[in-house]
A protein has these predicted regions:
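Surface-exposed, hydrophilic segments of mature proteins
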Residues: 3-4, 10-13, 20-224
Length: 224
């Protein structure tokens, strides 16, 4: 019986003398900070043209700057007003059913062409167009990509806009028929009819920047 007690006591002493080397390092001040997508747009918008005459034309350059984070970029064009406004005698003769609140015909004669500009406000053959040929303004109503996973006006498809870098989009417009030959844009107003007299057209153009990191397959699809 005494041996059993001593054995237990010895076992207790043995457990008490076991030691482990250890070291503790503490990492302090760990933080998680959300990044930001801040799109800045300079120049070119809004536009306000009055007293347009057939053959009038111009160019606007819009600059984009995405702060700090790479991003995809989408554009959306929405017509907010399209009216006859008033009905002159030549307009009534050309249109037949002109009413001040009726749909205007100005949009039938306005053409646009847009491209990725290098900042000099001039289209050059080596610059990437956003459309293959000039189009009616109304044909470009809706949502479309400037840079997404399927299209890139500024470089290789799949590469987003770089944060902290400036980009430019040139937009040429024409009240009439627009053509492009060897990089030269021309406007011919010969085919503009009297049905566009006094008409007004208003539209909204919006741009959306969307984070590219962890979002590599993003597309500027039509919103549901």
């Amino acid at each position: 019986m005494g041996v059993l007690v001593i054995g237990v006591a010895s076992l207790a002493i043995g457990w008490g003398t076991i030691a482990y080397f250890s070291d503790t390092e503490t990492s302090t001040g760990n933080t998680f900070t959300a990044g930001a997508i801040d799109l800045e747009i300079d120049g070119g918008l809004p536009v306000n043209f009055t007293d347009l005459k057939p053959g009038d034309h111009g160019e606007n350059t819009i600059s984009f700057h995405v702060e700090s984070n790479d991003a995809w970029l989408c554009a959306e064009v929405t017509i907010t007003e399209d009216k006859d406004v008033s009905c002159t005698e030549p307009e009534i003769e050309a249109e037949g059913n002109c009413t001040p609140e009726g749909d205007g015909e100005l949009d039938d004669y306005l053409m646009i062409f847009a491209w990725a500009d290098d900042g000099d406000n001039v289209f050059e053959p080596d610059e990437t167009p956003l459309m293959t040929t000039p189009v009616k303004l109304t044909d470009y109503v809706g949502r479309f990509p400037i840079v997404d996973s399927t299209f890139n006006a500024f470089g290789a498809i799949g590469n987003p806009l770089e944060g902290g870098k400036d980009y430019y989009i040139g937009v040429a417009w024409c009240f009439g028929d627009m053509t492009i030959q060897n990089g030269t844009i021309t406007c011919d107003g010969e085919n503009v009819g009297n049905d566009a007299q006094t008409d007004t057209l208003k539209l909204d153009v919006s741009f959306e920047a969307v984070q590219a990191r962890n979002n590599g397959n993003f597309k500027c699809v039509q919103p549901i």
